[in-house]
Every structure is written in C-alpha cells, then in structure tokens.
C-alpha cells in the first residue's frame, strides 16, 4: 500500500474529481493558479471546492491573469495572493501549500531571460521569509532547457543547490543527472 500522497495533475477539474474520489488517502492537486482569474467559473474556482471537500494539498503556481511571473517581486506577489486566499477563504493550512515559483530557460540568448534563475532564487528566499510554514517546489531542469546534456547537468546541480540554500523544500529532478554539491 502507498503511504505517500499521490499527486494528481490535470487541467480538467472533472479528471481531478475522478482521481480524488477513487484514491484512498490524501492527494496533492497539481496545480492551482490565477491564469484565468479566481471567479467561480475560473479553473481555480472550479478546483478549490474539490480540494476543500477532499482535504487535498495543492501545488500553487505563480501564474496570474497577466501570465507566468518572471520577476521575484511578481512571483512573491502572486504567491502571497494565492496563500492568503487558500488559507483565508478556503481554510487551508499553510503547510499544505507547495508554491512553485517557476523557472525558465536562461540560455535563450534573449536579454530578458538572463536573470530568470536569479529571480526564482530570490523569490524562494523572500517567500520563505514571509511565510516560514509554506512549502516550495520547483521543476529544476527548466532552467537549463536548450543546453547540451553536460552543461544541463552542471547548471541544474548548481541551480538546485542555490535554490535549496534559499529555502526550496522539494524539487522535480532526474536524480541521476544531479551532481552532489557541498
């Protein structure tokens, strides 16, 4: 029997509902965000009643009506809005929220993406300062997309280390492609 929470990942609320109804134990919903707002017909507004009914935890992405948050300030602003609504309106425990501050490829050659990794690290640090009980997670390898495999391994390893130092609690990584850092 599985004792770890199962993460249900779908953009369709009816798929999440089917999973929640069939799985024993506690689940984590991946994900909630404000991409299409927070009204009752938004995805957020349709998913959150399911989360509340089943006592699920959530992965909260730093995406709002303007798009995917790129700067540390924007990421923290969206995360704070999500945390405040999830704990205030929906009665969730802050420890049941896993904020994904998102990271983006930094090797695109475009000036506007050069600081994306730093912005993510700074957002994690500030978020953990403001909300010590919140959990954080991150898809680490997004930062190195487009690089050759050897460069990806090095960048992913260093980036993961820096994110953990900033307060990252969990990460989505290919463990065989991470170098130990001390």
Placement of each model-derived feature along the sequence:
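Catalytic beta/alpha-barrel core
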Residues: 3-12, 27-39, 94, 112
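Alpha-helix-loop-beta-strand connector modules within alpha/beta enzyme cores
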Residues: 1-10, 14, 18-24, 117-136
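Active-site-facing alpha/beta catalytic cores
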Residues: 1, 18-26, 30-32, 40, ...
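Catalytic alpha/beta core domains of metabolic enzymes, predominantly
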Residues: 40-42, 46, 51-182
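Unusually extended, aromatic-enriched hydrophobic runs near protein termini
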Residues: 4-23, 27-29, 149-156, 163, ...
């Amino acid at each position: 029997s599985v004792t770890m929470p199962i993460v249900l990942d779908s953009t369709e609320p009816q798929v999440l509902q089917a999973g929640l109804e069939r799985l024993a134990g506690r689940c984590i919903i991946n994900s909630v965000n404000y991409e299409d707002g927070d009204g009752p017909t938004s995805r957020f507004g349709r998913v959150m009643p399911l989360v509340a009914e089943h006592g699920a935890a959530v992965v909260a992405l730093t995406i709002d009506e303007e798009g995917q948050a790129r700067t540390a300030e924007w990421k923290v602003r969206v995360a704070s809005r999500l945390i405040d609504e999830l704990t205030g309106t929906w009665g969730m425990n802050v420890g049941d929220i896993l904020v994904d501050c998102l990271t983006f490829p930094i090797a695109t050659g475009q000036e506007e993406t050069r600081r994306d990794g730093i912005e993510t690290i700074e957002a994690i640090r500030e978020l953990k300062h403001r909300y010590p009980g919140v959990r954080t997670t991150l898809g680490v390898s997004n930062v190195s997309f487009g690089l050759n495999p050897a460069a990806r391994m090095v960048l992913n390893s260093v980036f993961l280390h820096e994110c953990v130092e900033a307060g990252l609690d969990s990460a989505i990584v290919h463990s065989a492609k991470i170098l130990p850092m001390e």
